[in-house]
Every structure is written in C-alpha cells, then in structure tokens.
Amino acid sequence: MKHLIILMIISLSLSASTMKMDYVGELSLFGEVANAEVVYDNDGEKYHIKITASGSGIIAKLTNDKQYILESIGLVEDGVLVPQKHIRSEYAKDYKKIKTYTIDRENNKTTISEYKKERVEESTFDIIHVRYDVTYKDVETKKEEVLDTIYKDDLISMFFNKNNNFLAMKDNETKYMSALGSKDTQEGIVVKHIKHEDDKSIFSVNIEKDYLSGGSKDATFVLDKENILYESRIDGILFFGNAIVRRVR
C-alpha cells in the first residue's frame, strides 16, 4: 500500500520551475500515520522530481522509522517530461535499498539495478557454555535485470506530465495508462474521471489488490483547478479503516 499512497501524492502543475508541497497520510482508526514532501524542479531543459515520505506514530514503529524516497530525473522536450532515470530508495536503521531504473531509449531497453545492504543476525551454539552466541554482520547484495521495452513515463512523471490532460477529461471518461516503476503501473492502470465538484475534479484509479486486505480496488483522488492534488482515498482496508492523503501546504 505504501507505493500506492506515494503514487497518489504526486500530481502537480508544471507552471512553475520550482515547487514544494507537503502532505499527510491518515488511517481512520489511528489518525495521522505518514507525511510526505514533494519537490519539483524544471529549468525547461532538465527536470528532477523528488518525493520523500515516512511514517509517523504506529506506522513509524511498524516500519522501523523507514524513509522512502522516489525520484524521477530526465529531459524536458517541448514542455513534456522525458524520464531517463527513476530511483526508488528505502532507508532505516541498519538497512538500505536502492532500486534504479535506467531508460535507454536509443536501444529500446530498460536496465533495473538493485542494491541492498542490511544487518543480519547469526547465531552459533556454544557447546561448552550450552548457549547460543549471537553476532551481527552487514550483508550486501546486488541484482540487475534488463527489460526489452521502454515506457513513455515512470510512475512519477505520469502524474506530472501536462500532455496527459487529466483536467480536460469529461465525466465517466477513462484513460488507460502504463508507466515504469511498479507492478500496478507497468501492467497498466485505468484512470476514470468521476465528476467536477466546485473548483475540483474527482477521479478514480483501478489498482491491484494484492497488497490490500479487503479494501476497495478503486482509489479516488481529487485535483484542484491548478492540477494539484487535494486529497486521495482508499476505503475499507481490513483492520485499518480508510486511508486518506491530504494536502497541508
């Protein structure tokens, strides 16, 4: 669920070269459980979008105060973001994981490299003292995979690119979209415009349910007239209630 919530807090207007937004995440049974900062830089030739998210309260304890960072880096061509690299990082005490997607448009392939470092526990039995002696060591692993395909967007640029025209959609109109960076977006998601309400537009996103426990497979999100996310929501998550992300600044 963490990647979906992060995915749904990244819809911003491209009218400014630098933009910063703050969001909080809430679960109906626990209140505020997460926060995120979005920083968007675009000089007209290159862009860099960085999303930093972390849990608070009970979620912080459950995730060992883990911090998540998502980045999209690339070129700007005729006002359109063209991703070259997508990076997903996770940091916690004695833990680091960095997954980098490098897009080679010339050769129509994408290289996915993953680096992970974590502290693991090892125990040996001391037969003399009849006990287990526990030690810890840092273990590093590296993996690489090559996809024989490329995507127009990654899961961040998909919601930033103005040529996707979300605000121009009519009631009940749908868009099928795919993007690099997660199982949901690579296999394709369906965005549906539900209705306009005052100065806001309400949409739904059809998602996979493998990481939900009984929740709705449709998440909703609300954009204001500037194409900036106002709120997103997933209802009926077992044991947790409803998950809501709200803009606070």
How would you name each of these model-derived features?
Residues H3-L14:
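Sec-dependent N-terminal signal peptides
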